[in-house]
A protein has these predicted regions:
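Membrane-embedded alpha-helical bundles that constitute the cytochrome b-like, heme-associated redox core
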Residues: 1-224
Length: 224
């Protein structure tokens, strides 16, 4: 039955060449850990993507219970962690995954830098990767406020003060991010939630798509 369904879809959309192109793509010899022990460093990018997928899936689960307002945010997190089945595990995955994805991305960036993989013709992909790194940092920062506890509140105040100190654009940028330039409150929490759940993930998916397309077009650089 599944074969007939696949054949029916393939007859109309011709999807076989698409997944064949992905599945049959040969891995370069120098990135195969089975033949070169040092090739494990090429896995950092794939591991970063794997952790990112876990972050997306666990984040989708968390949004089903989280309430982004100052009266119910902390209570919703408490309920999720103590009353929802596997809630503590999923939140723990999301919490520690946020740190792990930064570590993996840092290692991936070091590998690219020290092996000179950012050089011609891959300069554009390096720029895209740096933008992904900044988006990941922003995701970690905006997600830090969402539990709405004292630690998150003071950390956000410090962050907004740093933003405000920027010349010329500091105050307008703080107002845009926080909603209210004078107090960290309901507008700040709502905006951080929207930025964390909608704006930054959209930017991340677009940049990752561009990153993967460029990798397929240009290939994986060799060792120095």
């Amino acid at each position: 039955m599944l074969n007939r369904m696949y054949d029916w879809i393939d007859e109309r959309l011709d999807i076989t060449p698409i997944w064949r192109d992905i599945a049959d793509h040969e891995v370069p010899e120098h990135v195969n850990p089975a033949h070169h022990f040092s090739a494990f460093v090429y896995c950092f990018g794939g591991l970063t993507f794997f952790v990112t997928v876990i972050q997306i899936l666990s984040g989708m689960f968390l949004t089903m219970y989280y309430v982004p307002d100052i009266k119910n945010a902390w209570e919703s997190v408490y309920y999720l962690q103590n009353e929802v089945a596997f809630g503590q595990i999923v939140r723990g995955m999301h919490h520690w995954g946020a740190s792990l994805v930064i570590v993996m991305m840092f290692l991936h960036t070091l590998r690219v830098f020290f092996q000179g993989a950012y050089k011609k013709p891959r300069e554009l992909n390096w720029v895209v990767g740096v933008l992904i790194f900044f988006v990941m940092l922003a995701l970690g920062l905006t997600g830090y406020l969402l539990p709405w506890d004292m630690k998150a509140l003071f950390a956000t105040k410090v962050t907004l003060d740093i933003v405000e100190s920027l010349p010329f654009i500091g105050v307008p940028m703080k107002t845009l991010i926080a909603g209210d330039p004078t107090i960290v409150g309901a507008q700040t929490l709502t905006r951080f939630f929207a930025i964390h759940v909608f704006f930054l993930p959209a930017a991340l998916l677009a940049l990752m798509g561009a990153h993967f397309v460029l990798i397929r077009r240009q290939g994986i650089s060799g060792p120095l």
